């Protein structure tokens, strides 16, 4: 006699008599206990998805101005006033972007930044360090290479193309980015009065940059192609991009001195006589800059209005240049010491050598920018021979290496 086959749950294997209900399907059965278990699992899955969505929507914490300033201190020596101005402006810019996601009756204005300071004072480094800290795309352009659309040269919209390239053409990321335009003082118009003739590399470029800096929806060809009528364009909202413009503005100090009467010039008994020590520093003068001064220099009023935050940088003295060589996280001397350590060789710079290098950079009037070429020249022959020299333990750069072009001192393993 064959035993009648008992019905059982296809999932847990329990027989019909062990459960309250057994529901039949086309090719199997499921019990009430398994149904309840599946229900709980689905409910938990919904909760997990909601948590995931909330987690994804939560933005990373925006660093405070104090935190931004502290990070800049790690990489840039001096320029305390400029760092403070930048920290506040950058914090307010990204706070503004986040506030746009919430409905607000008050529209917050865009605060682009103008950096004014001598060559090699750290303008580019400040902008690069900010972008790296905030983990946002960064693009840099030289204003002297830009021209209006239709002229030979680099179209101003190419700057946006570079920004998109640096974030793999992710438009949302690009719109959180920073664009630094260097040598902005080189595109000033030749006189205060508007010219009848076209000024291709001056006022015309300012006009072309105006819309981008102010905020517009620019059409950019994908993957760096050329524009043509049938092409589908990428649309980038530049009102969300932070623009930082920088320049040396040589001669602007004279314009400010003339307006504020701080130059100490004059003849006769009523003249304002000053000794050199009392002369107002370049940084203090630039802190007093007004839109009218920039107009006299050659920037158009509309362009000045789009750069409301002005951060002046000071000239670097000998002490600052020595610190730049040794103190920042990526200081030049540290970089070359790492290079030499890859060959298991120690590299040392004497204090006198560091001072001599700083003096040489000051004499060349290249600021911090000229330090790398000085160090590279000093170590060129040594680096050329380095892989071929056996038992070399240490290389010492002394003052004579800098001032008299003597070879660095080599020490060998005994």
Swiss-Prot record:
The keyword Cell inner membrane does not apply. Disulfide bonds: none annotated. Pfam families: AAA_2, ClpB_D2-small, zf-C4_ClpX. One of its GO terms (biological process) is proteolysis involved in protein catabolic process. Keywords: ATP-binding, Chaperone, Metal-binding, Nucleotide-binding, Zinc. Residues 1-50 form the ClpX-type ZB domain. PROSITE patterns: CLPX_ZB. Signal peptide: none annotated. Zn(2+) binds at residues 9, 12, 31, 34. GO terms for cellular component: HslUV protease complex. ATP binds at residues 118-125. The keyword Signal does not apply. GO terms for molecular function: ATP binding; ATP hydrolysis activity; ATP-dependent protein folding chaperone; protein dimerization activity; unfolded protein binding; zinc ion binding. ATP-dependent specificity component of the Clp protease. It directs the protease to specific substrates. Can perform chaperone functions in the absence of ClpP. NCBIfam families: clpX, PRK05342.1. Component of the ClpX-ClpP complex. Forms a hexameric ring that, in the presence of ATP, binds to fourteen ClpP subunits assembled into a disk-like structure with a central cavity, resembling the structure of eukaryotic proteasomes. Belongs to the ClpX chaperone family. This is ATP-dependent Clp protease ATP-binding subunit ClpX.
